[in-house]
Amino acid sequence: MDTFSTKSLALQAQKKVLSKMASKAMVAVFVDNTSSEVLDELYQATKEFTRSRKEAQRVVKNLVKVAVKLAVLLRADQLDSNELAQLQRFRGRVRSLAMTALSFHQVDFTFDRRVLATGLLECRDLLHQAIGPHLTAKSHGRINHIFSHFANGDFLAALYSPAEPYRSHLCRICDGLGRMLDEGGI
């Protein structure tokens, strides 16, 4: 039996084209201003921490590519009810984690890197479960790269330290997260 499907082929082509276009211009199409500001601050903090512009670009580019692929899957109704339920759990966990990150920023001496790292790794696992069958091994690698970077305890400790420039980045990240939570973006 021939398993050729033009719908499947079109979806693959769409994901391939969009993955090649994950630039700052494409971010503007798929994310709002607040999300873009948060991504810019995450890029700056990552660049500062890794001391590598290339690595910081890679992390943010991978994040954008995964978000775009997820949007394509949702738009094309490719996820079944079980995968959509997993995605809802992922969204709920991300929202909870954003509130925790804000709380750690707003209340002195409450930061616990293990809580954030564990939460980020849980989000990674939920995302793999939700959209796993629809992605290539390379996309799964991107998801692992993104979450392993942001769940790195040393990165989190630096980000939440009172030292500059991390303090300013964290303030702007948390301002953006607060707006996204208020507007329902997370």
Curated annotation (Swiss-Prot):
<dbReference type="GO" id="GO:0005737">
    <property type="term" value="C:cytoplasm"/>
</dbReference>
<comment type="function">
    <text>Acts as a negative regulator of mTOR activity.</text>
</comment>
<protein>
    <recommendedName>
        <fullName>Tumor necrosis factor alpha-induced protein 8-like protein 1</fullName>
    </recommendedName>
</protein>
<dbReference type="GO" id="GO:0042981">
    <property type="term" value="P:regulation of apoptotic process"/>
</dbReference>
<keyword id="KW-0963">Cytoplasm</keyword>
<comment type="subunit">
    <text>Interacts with FBXW5; TNFAIP8L1 competes with TSC2 to bind FBXW5 increasing TSC2 stability by preventing its ubiquitination.</text>
</comment>
<dbReference type="InterPro" id="IPR008477">
    <property type="entry name" value="TNFAIP8-like"/>
</dbReference>
<dbReference type="GO" id="GO:0042802">
    <property type="term" value="F:identical protein binding"/>
</dbReference>
<dbReference type="GO" id="GO:0032007">
    <property type="term" value="P:negative regulation of TOR signaling"/>
</dbReference>
<dbReference type="InterPro" id="IPR038355">
    <property type="entry name" value="TNFAIP8_sf"/>
</dbReference>
<dbReference type="Pfam" id="PF05527">
    <property type="entry name" value="DUF758"/>
</dbReference>
<comment type="similarity">
    <text>Belongs to the TNFAIP8 family.</text>
</comment>
